[in-house]
């Protein structure tokens, strides 16, 4: 379901101008990243991302993590356009204001459609690896009919410079998480200036060394973006798509410069951007044809979601209970009882144990009860006593 009469470039421009207007209205924020990433984000949402704004908690939705959390207006603008009920135009106007649902960085549980809180660089991509692991584990338990979704990440240069990303990337490659796709907003600009002031890593080679499938594209060419995502959906490895973009895209004054990274465009610069992109609309104003095109994007997965709900309703009752138990994070009362019993034992006996030994004893009373338990230790599990002696984790 899509509106073929509306240019995807213009749909992306709608995202750009909402971001620019919101940051200017707040007099703070990061306009450059949403301006540069709007093209590949538009293709991702309109062509691939399996979500339904009318059912934001649909359990088999795709997950999208904006690891580059400073670019939050990219998500907020699109969420407004595709129809998340909390993301009204007034919320866009109130970007970064107290009591809004549009904080400077996305916050889980505060705003619909936000899968995890991001902001500290590297945190989002690492959390997404955990989400991709969870999808594969749940799929092995409940099958493709119930669990079959992808995890997408929008990551920045800064994300990939952080140490935490190295461990997560290595683990994802080692586990062969083929349903994990990272869209790397490679604009070669940091807030201090050109990226080469601080980093010269060939990210494609780094990811390849960790077992990822990689490709590089023009992050403003919609045909290249669509083809790249379509191809990476077919691989047996986690995927990195290096989207070469221009930060502050569309601004004749600030495109490609660090000046667009973390400061609003002034009115003259916005007027020049409007002339450059042939945008004739006022602040926070989206023309009807673009609104309609984006609303269709928001509706395109309704049928898939309803079909999934029907499949879920037909599975064995015991299996359904286990699935909902896992999804909701429900924990048996037996866990609390067993832990309390162990605490009383320690209190009565005062055993002399290393912390790792008492930790192992706790794990051994909860592992058999919590099927969702994931644990281990990087190459030293026998020393750390994180491997259970009474069953698999």
Question: Which ranges hold each PLM region?
Answer:
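Accessory "access/gating" subregions that flank catalytic or transport cores
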Residues: 361-372, 377-382
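Generic start-of-chain signal for non-secretory N-termini
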Residues: 1-14
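Hard-cation-handling environments
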Residues: 299-358, 366-369
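Conserved small/polar residues in nucleotide/adenosyl-binding loops
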Residues: 383-389
């Amino acid at each position: 379901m899509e509106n073929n009469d509306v240019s995807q470039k213009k749909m992306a421009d709608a995202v750009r101008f909402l971001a620019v207007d919101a940051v200017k209205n707040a007099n703070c924020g990061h306009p450059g990243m949403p301006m540069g990433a709007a093209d590949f984000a538009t293709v991702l949402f309109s062509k691939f991302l399996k979500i339904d704004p009318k059912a934001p908690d649909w359990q088999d939705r795709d997950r999208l993590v904006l690891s580059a959390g400073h670019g939050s207006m990219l998500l907020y603008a699109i969420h407004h356009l595709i129809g998340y009920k909390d993301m009204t135009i007034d919320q866009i106007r109130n970007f970064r204001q107290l009591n809004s649902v549009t904080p400077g960085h996305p916050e889980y549980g505060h705003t619909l459609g936000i899968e995890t809180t991001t902001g500290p660089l590297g945190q989002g991509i690492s959390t997404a690896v955990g989400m991709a692991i969870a999808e594969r584990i749940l799929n092995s338990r409940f099958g493709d009919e119930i669990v079959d979704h992808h995890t997408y990440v929008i990551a920045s240069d800064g994300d990939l410079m952080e140490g935490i990303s190295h461990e997560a990337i290595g683990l994802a490659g080692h586990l062969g998480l083929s349903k994990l796709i990272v869209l790397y907003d490679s604009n070669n600009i940091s807030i201090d200036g050109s990226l080469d002031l601080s980093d010269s890593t060939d990210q494609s080679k780094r990811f390849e060394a960790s077992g990822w499938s990689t490709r590089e594209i023009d992050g403003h060419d919609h045909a290249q973006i669509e083809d790249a995502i379509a191809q990476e959906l077919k691989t047996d490895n986690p995927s990195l798509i290096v989207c070469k973009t221009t930060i502050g895209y569309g601004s004749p004054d600030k495109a490609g410069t660090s000046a667009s990274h973390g400061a609003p465009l002034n009115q003259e610069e916005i007027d020049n951007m409007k002339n450059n992109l042939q945008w004739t609309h006022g602040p926070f104003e989206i023309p009807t044809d673009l609104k309609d095109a984006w609303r269709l994007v928001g509706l395109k997965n309704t049928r898939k979601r309803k079909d999934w709900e029907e499949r879920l309703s037909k599975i064995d009752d015991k299996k359904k209970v286990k699935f909902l138990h896992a999804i909701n994070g429900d924990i048996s009362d037996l866990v609390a009882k067993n832990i309390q019993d162990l605490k009383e034992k320690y209190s009565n006996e005062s055993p002399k144990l290393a912390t790792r030994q008492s930790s192992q004893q706790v794990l051994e009373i909860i592992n058999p009860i919590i099927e969702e338990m994931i644990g281990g230790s990087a190459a030293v599990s026998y020393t750390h006593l994180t491997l259970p002696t009474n069953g698999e984790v």
